[in-house]
Design a protein with these regions (language model features):
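Acidic catalytic patch
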Residues: 37-40, 59-87
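Acidic, PIN/NYN-like endoribonuclease modules and their adjacent C-terminal/linker elements
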Residues: 1, 85, 98-129
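Short beta-strand scaffold positions
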Residues: 4, 35, 73, 92-95, ...
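Short active-site oxyanion
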Residues: 30-32, 70, 102-106
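Alpha-helix capping/helix-boundary segments
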Residues: 8, 39, 78, 96-97, ...
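Short, well-structured N-terminal submotif of metal-dependent ribonuclease cores
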Residues: 1-35, 50-60, 121-129
Length: 129
C-alpha cells in the first residue's frame, strides 16, 4: 500500500502538469493507495483556492477519486458523510469536521450560517456557541 500526499492527488485530478499527472496515474494503477482525511481536506482547499473549483466540482472530483477500486481512505464513513453534507451547501472542511465527531457528541460553532446549514441538512446535535 502507498500513502499519497496532496500534490499527488491534485496532479491526478487536474492533470495540470503532464509529467506528474502521468506519474500519479501510474502510481494509482500500480496498487493499493491510502489517502488520509487531511490529504482530502488539503486537496479540497487547493482545488478551490488555486484551481477555482466550486463545492460541487470538489465533491464530484473526490467522489470519483474515492470510487477507484484500489483507493482506501481514512475513516471512509465520515468522508462519505462529509461529501453528502456538501450537497447542502456546507463546505468540505466544515462537513469533514462535523462528520468526524464521535457518535452522539454535540458539535458547536460560532458560525451561525454553518449551524443553520447543518441543521437544514438534518445534522443533529449541532449548536451555536
Amino acid at each position: 500500500m502507498t500513502a499519497v500526499d496532496t500534490n499527488v492527488v491534485v496532479r491526478l485530478l487536474t492533470g495540470d502538469d503532464a509529467k506528474q499527472a502521468a506519474a500519479a496515474r501510474a502510481l494509482f494503477a500500480a496498487g493499493p493507495i491510502w489517502i488520509a482525511k487531511t490529504v482530502l481536506l488539503e486537496s479540497g482547499w487547493v482545488l478551490r483556492s488555486l484551481y477555482g473549483f466550486d463545492t460541487g466540482a470538489i465533491r464530484d472530483a473526490l467522489t470519483r477519486l474515492l470510487g477507484l477500486k484500489n483507493v482506501r481512505v481514512e475513516d471512509a464513513a465520515a468522508v462519505a458523510a462529509a461529501l453528502t453534507l456538501t450537497q447542502s451547501g456546507i463546505d468540505l472542511a466544515d462537513a469533514m469536521h462535523l462528520s468526524s465527531r464521535p457518535v452522539g457528541a454535540r458539535f458547536v460553532s460560532f458560525d451561525k450560517a454553518f449551524v443553520a446549514r447543518a441543521k437544514r441538512a438534518g445534522a443533529s446535535g449541532v449548536a451555536r456557541v
